[in-house]
From Swiss-Prot:
HAMAP family: PurT. This is Formate-dependent phosphoribosylglycinamide formyltransferase. It is an enzyme of class 6 (ligase). InterPro entries: ATP-grasp, ATP-grasp_carboxylate-amine, ATP_grasp_subdomain_1, PreATP-grasp_dom_sf, PurT, PurT/PurK_preATP-grasp, PurT_C, Rudment_hybrid_motif.
Amino acid sequence: MYQSKKVLLLGSGELGKEVVIEAQRLGVQTVAVDSYEHAPAMQVAHNSYVVDMLDPEQIRTIIEKENPDLIVPEVEAIATDELLKLEEEGFHVIPNARAAKLTMDREGIRRLAAETLGLATAGYEFANTYDEFIQAAAQIGFPCVVKPLMSSSGKGQSVCRSEADLESCWETAMEGGRVKNGRVIVEEFIPFESEITLLTVRAVNGTAFCEPIGHVQKDGDYIESWQPHDMTEQQIEEAKHIAKTITDELGGYGLFGVELFLAKDRVYFSEVSPRPHDTGLVTLVTQNLSEFALHVRAILGFPITEITQLSPGASRPLKAPEELADYTVEGLENALAVPKTQVRVFGKPITKAGRRMAVALSAADSVETARENAKKALDQLILK
Protein backbone atom coordinates (compact mmCIF):
# COMPACT_ATOMS: atom_id res chain seq x y z
CA MET A 1 0.00 0.00 0.00
CA TYR A 2 1.18 3.52 -0.82
CA GLN A 3 2.49 5.15 2.36
CA SER A 4 1.38 8.76 2.10
CA LYS A 5 1.75 11.72 4.41
CA LYS A 6 -1.34 12.71 6.35
CA VAL A 7 -2.54 16.31 6.65
CA LEU A 8 -5.28 17.30 9.12
CA LEU A 9 -7.11 20.57 8.46
CA LEU A 10 -8.62 22.51 11.35
CA GLY A 11 -11.27 24.43 9.43
CA SER A 12 -12.92 23.09 6.30
CA GLY A 13 -14.35 26.01 4.33
CA GLU A 14 -13.91 26.86 0.66
CA LEU A 15 -10.23 27.70 1.07
CA GLY A 16 -9.60 24.46 2.91
CA LYS A 17 -11.36 22.57 0.12
CA GLU A 18 -8.83 23.85 -2.41
CA VAL A 19 -5.98 22.95 -0.04
CA VAL A 20 -7.31 19.39 0.25
CA ILE A 21 -7.55 19.06 -3.54
CA GLU A 22 -3.98 20.29 -4.03
CA ALA A 23 -2.69 17.98 -1.27
CA GLN A 24 -4.42 14.98 -2.83
CA ARG A 25 -2.81 15.78 -6.18
CA LEU A 26 0.51 15.11 -4.46
CA GLY A 27 -0.70 11.85 -2.93
CA VAL A 28 -1.39 13.21 0.55
CA GLN A 29 -4.03 11.66 2.82
CA THR A 30 -6.40 14.37 4.08
CA VAL A 31 -8.59 14.79 7.16
CA ALA A 32 -11.02 17.71 7.39
CA VAL A 33 -12.27 19.02 10.75
CA ASP A 34 -14.84 21.74 11.39
CA SER A 35 -17.73 22.71 13.65
CA TYR A 36 -20.50 21.73 11.20
CA GLU A 37 -21.30 18.78 8.96
CA HIS A 38 -20.75 18.70 5.19
CA ALA A 39 -18.34 21.64 5.20
CA PRO A 40 -16.74 22.19 1.76
CA ALA A 41 -13.40 20.52 2.51
CA MET A 42 -15.19 17.54 4.08
CA GLN A 43 -16.79 16.85 0.70
CA VAL A 44 -13.41 16.00 -0.84
CA ALA A 45 -11.27 14.85 2.12
CA HIS A 46 -10.56 11.18 2.84
CA ASN A 47 -11.96 11.51 6.36
CA SER A 48 -13.74 14.17 8.41
CA TYR A 49 -14.89 15.08 11.92
CA VAL A 50 -17.30 17.58 13.44
CA VAL A 51 -16.05 19.09 16.72
CA ASP A 52 -16.17 22.26 18.78
CA MET A 53 -13.03 23.91 17.41
CA LEU A 54 -12.51 25.90 20.63
CA ASP A 55 -12.70 22.80 22.85
CA PRO A 56 -9.13 21.65 23.59
CA GLU A 57 -10.18 18.13 24.60
CA GLN A 58 -12.08 17.52 21.36
CA ILE A 59 -9.19 18.87 19.27
CA ARG A 60 -6.67 16.70 21.13
CA THR A 61 -8.82 13.57 20.83
CA ILE A 62 -9.05 13.84 17.03
CA ILE A 63 -5.37 14.67 16.57
CA GLU A 64 -4.20 11.81 18.79
CA LYS A 65 -6.54 9.43 16.96
CA GLU A 66 -5.44 10.47 13.46
CA ASN A 67 -1.76 11.14 14.31
CA PRO A 68 -1.23 13.42 11.28
CA ASP A 69 2.15 14.42 9.89
CA LEU A 70 0.93 18.01 9.59
CA ILE A 71 -1.78 19.97 11.42
CA VAL A 72 -2.97 22.79 9.16
CA PRO A 73 -5.14 25.51 10.78
CA GLU A 74 -7.49 27.05 8.21
CA VAL A 75 -9.44 29.37 10.53
CA GLU A 76 -8.58 31.62 13.48
CA ALA A 77 -11.01 30.26 16.07
CA ILE A 78 -9.17 27.17 17.30
CA ALA A 79 -8.02 26.03 20.75
CA THR A 80 -4.52 27.37 20.05
CA ASP A 81 -3.22 26.79 23.58
CA GLU A 82 -3.79 23.08 22.98
CA LEU A 83 -1.88 23.34 19.69
CA LEU A 84 1.08 24.73 21.65
CA LYS A 85 0.97 21.69 23.94
CA LEU A 86 0.60 19.28 21.03
CA GLU A 87 3.55 20.89 19.27
CA GLU A 88 5.68 20.43 22.39
CA GLU A 89 4.71 16.75 22.30
CA GLY A 90 6.05 16.40 18.76
CA PHE A 91 3.12 17.21 16.48
CA HIS A 92 3.89 19.54 13.55
CA VAL A 93 1.61 22.58 13.37
CA ILE A 94 1.64 24.77 10.23
CA PRO A 95 3.40 27.15 10.16
CA ASN A 96 3.86 26.68 13.91
CA ALA A 97 1.66 26.87 17.00
CA ARG A 98 2.98 30.29 18.05
CA ALA A 99 1.96 31.81 14.71
CA ALA A 100 -1.47 30.18 14.98
CA LYS A 101 -1.92 31.66 18.46
CA LEU A 102 -0.61 35.13 17.59
CA THR A 103 -2.91 35.41 14.58
CA MET A 104 -5.93 33.93 16.37
CA ASP A 105 -6.95 37.44 17.37
CA ARG A 106 -6.05 40.95 16.31
CA GLU A 107 -4.30 41.95 19.52
CA GLY A 108 -1.40 39.52 19.40
CA ILE A 109 -0.43 40.23 15.82
CA ARG A 110 -0.96 44.00 16.07
CA ARG A 111 1.24 44.30 19.14
CA LEU A 112 3.90 42.14 17.46
CA ALA A 113 3.86 44.23 14.27
CA ALA A 114 3.73 47.69 15.84
CA GLU A 115 5.43 47.32 19.22
CA THR A 116 7.98 44.56 18.63
CA LEU A 117 8.83 44.95 14.94
CA GLY A 118 8.18 48.68 14.59
CA LEU A 119 6.08 48.35 11.43
CA ALA A 120 3.82 51.22 10.37
CA THR A 121 0.22 50.54 11.44
CA ALA A 122 -2.89 52.56 12.19
CA GLY A 123 -3.03 53.91 15.75
CA TYR A 124 -4.99 51.59 18.03
CA GLU A 125 -6.47 51.01 21.48
CA PHE A 126 -8.13 47.97 23.05
CA ALA A 127 -11.30 47.86 25.15
CA ASN A 128 -13.01 45.20 27.28
CA THR A 129 -16.13 47.14 28.25
CA TYR A 130 -18.40 49.75 26.71
CA ASP A 131 -16.96 52.44 29.00
CA GLU A 132 -13.42 51.53 27.96
CA PHE A 133 -14.58 51.57 24.33
CA ILE A 134 -15.92 55.14 24.67
CA GLN A 135 -12.57 56.23 26.13
CA ALA A 136 -10.62 54.41 23.40
CA ALA A 137 -12.68 56.03 20.63
CA ALA A 138 -12.15 59.46 22.18
CA GLN A 139 -8.41 58.85 22.33
CA ILE A 140 -8.14 57.59 18.73
CA GLY A 141 -10.56 60.22 17.38
CA PHE A 142 -13.30 60.08 14.76
CA PRO A 143 -13.70 58.47 12.35
CA CYS A 144 -12.31 55.24 13.75
CA VAL A 145 -12.63 51.56 12.85
CA VAL A 146 -14.08 49.13 15.41
CA LYS A 147 -13.40 45.38 15.19
CA PRO A 148 -13.90 42.41 17.51
CA LEU A 149 -10.56 40.86 18.38
CA MET A 150 -11.67 37.56 16.89
CA SER A 151 -13.95 37.29 13.88
CA SER A 152 -13.98 35.78 10.41
CA SER A 153 -14.67 37.35 7.01
CA GLY A 154 -14.88 40.81 8.51
CA LYS A 155 -17.88 40.07 10.73
CA GLY A 156 -18.47 42.67 13.42
CA GLN A 157 -16.45 45.46 11.81
CA SER A 158 -17.75 48.99 11.39
CA VAL A 159 -16.64 52.59 10.97
CA CYS A 160 -17.53 54.86 13.87
CA ARG A 161 -17.87 58.35 12.40
CA SER A 162 -19.04 60.25 15.50
CA GLU A 163 -20.15 59.82 19.10
CA ALA A 164 -23.65 59.10 17.77
CA ASP A 165 -22.35 55.83 16.27
CA LEU A 166 -20.70 54.51 19.43
CA GLU A 167 -23.54 52.33 20.69
CA SER A 168 -24.35 50.74 17.32
CA CYS A 169 -20.66 50.07 16.57
CA TRP A 170 -20.20 48.40 19.96
CA GLU A 171 -23.26 46.21 19.37
CA THR A 172 -22.03 45.27 15.89
CA ALA A 173 -18.68 44.17 17.32
CA MET A 174 -20.31 42.17 20.11
CA GLU A 175 -22.65 40.37 17.71
CA GLY A 176 -20.05 39.71 15.03
CA GLY A 177 -17.18 38.37 17.11
CA ARG A 178 -16.35 34.69 17.47
CA VAL A 179 -16.48 35.20 21.24
CA LYS A 180 -19.60 37.04 22.37
CA ASN A 181 -19.09 40.03 24.67
CA GLY A 182 -15.38 39.96 23.87
CA ARG A 183 -12.59 42.50 23.59
CA VAL A 184 -12.43 44.99 20.71
CA ILE A 185 -9.75 46.96 18.90
CA VAL A 186 -10.38 50.60 18.01
CA GLU A 187 -8.22 51.74 15.10
CA GLU A 188 -7.32 55.06 13.57
CA PHE A 189 -9.01 55.47 10.18
CA ILE A 190 -6.24 55.55 7.57
CA PRO A 191 -7.22 57.61 4.48
CA PHE A 192 -5.81 54.93 2.17
CA GLU A 193 -5.91 54.92 -1.61
CA SER A 194 -6.25 51.16 -1.87
CA GLU A 195 -6.01 47.88 0.05
CA ILE A 196 -3.90 44.96 -1.09
CA THR A 197 -3.02 41.43 -0.11
CA LEU A 198 0.60 40.42 -0.69
CA LEU A 199 0.66 36.62 -0.75
CA THR A 200 4.00 35.65 0.76
CA VAL A 201 5.40 32.11 0.64
CA ARG A 202 8.01 30.83 3.07
CA ALA A 203 9.54 27.65 1.67
CA VAL A 204 12.64 25.55 2.17
CA ASN A 205 14.48 27.62 -0.45
CA GLY A 206 13.49 31.06 0.88
CA THR A 207 10.69 33.63 0.65
CA ALA A 208 8.76 34.36 -2.55
CA PHE A 209 5.97 36.80 -3.36
CA CYS A 210 2.97 36.73 -5.66
CA GLU A 211 1.95 39.80 -7.62
CA PRO A 212 -0.06 42.15 -5.35
CA ILE A 213 -3.80 41.58 -5.17
CA GLY A 214 -6.06 44.61 -4.95
CA HIS A 215 -9.40 44.26 -3.22
CA VAL A 216 -12.50 46.11 -2.13
CA GLN A 217 -13.99 45.46 1.31
CA LYS A 218 -17.49 46.10 2.53
CA ASP A 219 -18.21 45.75 6.25
CA GLY A 220 -14.78 44.17 6.59
CA ASP A 221 -15.41 41.37 4.07
CA TYR A 222 -14.07 41.28 0.55
CA ILE A 223 -16.51 41.80 -2.32
CA GLU A 224 -13.99 41.93 -5.18
CA SER A 225 -10.32 41.17 -5.78
CA TRP A 226 -8.01 41.49 -8.77
CA GLN A 227 -4.42 40.73 -9.69
CA PRO A 228 -2.08 42.41 -10.36
CA HIS A 229 -2.74 45.66 -8.53
CA ASP A 230 -0.88 48.66 -9.94
CA MET A 231 1.80 49.92 -7.52
CA THR A 232 4.94 52.03 -7.72
CA GLU A 233 8.33 50.35 -7.35
CA GLN A 234 8.77 52.07 -4.00
CA GLN A 235 5.40 50.79 -2.76
CA ILE A 236 6.22 47.25 -3.90
CA GLU A 237 9.58 47.29 -2.12
CA GLU A 238 8.01 48.69 1.05
CA ALA A 239 5.23 46.08 0.92
CA LYS A 240 7.71 43.24 0.46
CA HIS A 241 9.82 44.53 3.34
CA ILE A 242 6.80 44.59 5.67
CA ALA A 243 5.62 41.15 4.51
CA LYS A 244 9.04 39.55 4.89
CA THR A 245 9.59 41.14 8.30
CA ILE A 246 6.31 39.86 9.75
CA THR A 247 6.48 36.40 8.15
CA ASP A 248 10.11 35.90 9.18
CA GLU A 249 9.09 36.69 12.75
CA LEU A 250 6.22 34.18 12.59
CA GLY A 251 8.44 31.55 10.97
CA GLY A 252 7.67 28.12 9.59
CA TYR A 253 6.74 27.12 6.05
CA GLY A 254 3.58 27.95 4.14
CA LEU A 255 1.70 30.78 2.49
CA PHE A 256 0.78 33.95 4.38
CA GLY A 257 -1.80 36.52 3.36
CA VAL A 258 -0.38 39.91 4.36
CA GLU A 259 -2.97 42.71 4.22
CA LEU A 260 -1.68 46.24 3.65
CA PHE A 261 -3.04 49.76 3.19
CA LEU A 262 -1.54 51.91 0.44
CA ALA A 263 -1.65 55.59 1.40
CA LYS A 264 -0.09 58.57 -0.36
CA ASP A 265 2.89 58.75 1.94
CA ARG A 266 3.54 55.13 2.92
CA VAL A 267 2.45 51.49 3.17
CA TYR A 268 0.74 50.41 6.40
CA PHE A 269 0.53 46.90 7.84
CA SER A 270 -3.04 45.81 8.57
CA GLU A 271 -3.28 42.06 9.26
CA VAL A 272 -1.68 38.72 8.40
CA SER A 273 -3.13 35.23 8.08
CA PRO A 274 -0.74 32.23 8.13
CA ARG A 275 -2.80 30.45 5.47
CA PRO A 276 -4.40 31.05 2.06
CA HIS A 277 -6.43 34.25 1.88
CA ASP A 278 -9.97 34.74 0.57
CA THR A 279 -8.87 37.54 -1.78
CA GLY A 280 -6.34 35.07 -3.20
CA LEU A 281 -9.06 32.93 -4.79
CA VAL A 282 -8.26 34.96 -7.91
CA THR A 283 -4.95 33.07 -8.21
CA LEU A 284 -6.92 30.03 -9.38
CA VAL A 285 -7.06 31.74 -12.79
CA THR A 286 -4.05 34.09 -12.75
CA GLN A 287 -0.99 32.07 -11.71
CA ASN A 288 0.82 28.88 -12.75
CA LEU A 289 0.47 27.82 -9.11
CA SER A 290 -2.54 29.01 -7.12
CA GLU A 291 -2.14 30.17 -3.53
CA PHE A 292 -3.41 26.73 -2.49
CA ALA A 293 -0.82 24.85 -4.56
CA LEU A 294 1.90 27.12 -3.19
CA HIS A 295 0.76 26.53 0.40
CA VAL A 296 0.74 22.75 -0.02
CA ARG A 297 4.13 22.61 -1.71
CA ALA A 298 5.68 24.82 0.96
CA ILE A 299 4.27 22.92 3.96
CA LEU A 300 5.37 19.60 2.46
CA GLY A 301 8.92 20.92 2.31
CA PHE A 302 9.17 21.36 -1.45
CA PRO A 303 10.99 24.37 -2.94
CA ILE A 304 9.06 27.13 -4.70
CA THR A 305 11.13 27.62 -7.85
CA GLU A 306 8.89 30.07 -9.70
CA ILE A 307 5.59 31.90 -9.42
CA THR A 308 4.41 33.01 -12.85
CA GLN A 309 1.57 35.42 -13.53
CA LEU A 310 -0.21 33.86 -16.51
CA SER A 311 -2.91 36.48 -16.90
CA PRO A 312 -4.58 39.41 -15.19
CA GLY A 313 -7.71 38.28 -13.37
CA ALA A 314 -10.49 39.16 -10.95
CA SER A 315 -12.86 37.49 -8.51
CA ARG A 316 -16.33 38.30 -7.19
CA PRO A 317 -17.87 36.23 -4.37
CA LEU A 318 -21.57 35.35 -4.29
CA LYS A 319 -22.94 36.14 -0.84
CA ALA A 320 -26.22 34.87 0.55
CA PRO A 321 -28.87 37.51 1.33
CA GLU A 322 -30.59 35.35 3.95
CA GLU A 323 -30.60 31.98 5.67
CA LEU A 324 -31.96 29.09 3.61
CA ALA A 325 -31.96 25.45 4.68
CA ASP A 326 -32.47 24.33 1.07
CA TYR A 327 -31.13 26.31 -1.84
CA THR A 328 -29.90 26.15 -5.42
CA VAL A 329 -27.50 28.33 -7.40
CA GLU A 330 -29.25 29.43 -10.57
CA GLY A 331 -27.78 31.21 -13.58
CA LEU A 332 -24.65 29.05 -13.91
CA GLU A 333 -25.17 28.56 -17.65
CA ASN A 334 -25.15 32.32 -18.28
CA ALA A 335 -22.29 32.98 -15.86
CA LEU A 336 -20.11 30.34 -17.49
CA ALA A 337 -20.81 31.89 -20.91
CA VAL A 338 -18.78 34.98 -19.95
CA PRO A 339 -15.36 34.75 -21.69
CA LYS A 340 -12.51 33.12 -19.76
CA THR A 341 -14.68 32.80 -16.67
CA GLN A 342 -15.07 30.03 -14.11
CA VAL A 343 -17.50 29.62 -11.23
CA ARG A 344 -16.74 27.66 -8.07
CA VAL A 345 -19.80 26.67 -6.03
CA PHE A 346 -18.67 25.89 -2.50
CA GLY A 347 -21.46 23.45 -1.61
CA LYS A 348 -22.06 24.73 1.91
CA PRO A 349 -24.99 22.86 3.51
CA ILE A 350 -27.07 25.96 4.31
CA THR A 351 -26.90 29.66 3.58
CA LYS A 352 -26.58 32.42 6.16
CA ALA A 353 -26.94 36.14 5.59
CA GLY A 354 -23.64 37.40 4.19
CA ARG A 355 -22.12 33.93 3.82
CA ARG A 356 -19.93 33.30 0.77
CA MET A 357 -21.53 30.55 -1.29
CA ALA A 358 -19.64 30.70 -4.61
CA VAL A 359 -17.13 32.80 -6.52
CA ALA A 360 -16.86 34.04 -10.10
CA LEU A 361 -13.30 34.02 -11.47
CA SER A 362 -12.35 35.78 -14.70
CA ALA A 363 -9.07 35.98 -16.60
CA ALA A 364 -8.56 38.60 -19.31
CA ASP A 365 -5.96 40.64 -21.17
CA SER A 366 -6.37 43.47 -18.65
CA VAL A 367 -7.42 43.85 -15.04
CA GLU A 368 -10.21 46.20 -16.11
CA THR A 369 -11.76 43.62 -18.46
CA ALA A 370 -11.34 40.86 -15.89
CA ARG A 371 -13.14 42.95 -13.26
CA GLU A 372 -15.97 43.71 -15.68
CA ASN A 373 -16.35 40.04 -16.64
CA ALA A 374 -16.27 38.81 -13.04
CA LYS A 375 -19.08 41.25 -12.24
CA LYS A 376 -21.05 40.14 -15.31
CA ALA A 377 -20.75 36.52 -14.22
CA LEU A 378 -21.67 37.28 -10.61
CA ASP A 379 -24.74 39.23 -11.75
CA GLN A 380 -26.03 36.05 -13.43
CA LEU A 381 -25.89 34.00 -10.23
CA ILE A 382 -28.94 33.80 -7.98
CA LEU A 383 -29.46 31.86 -4.75
CA LYS A 384 -32.96 30.41 -4.44
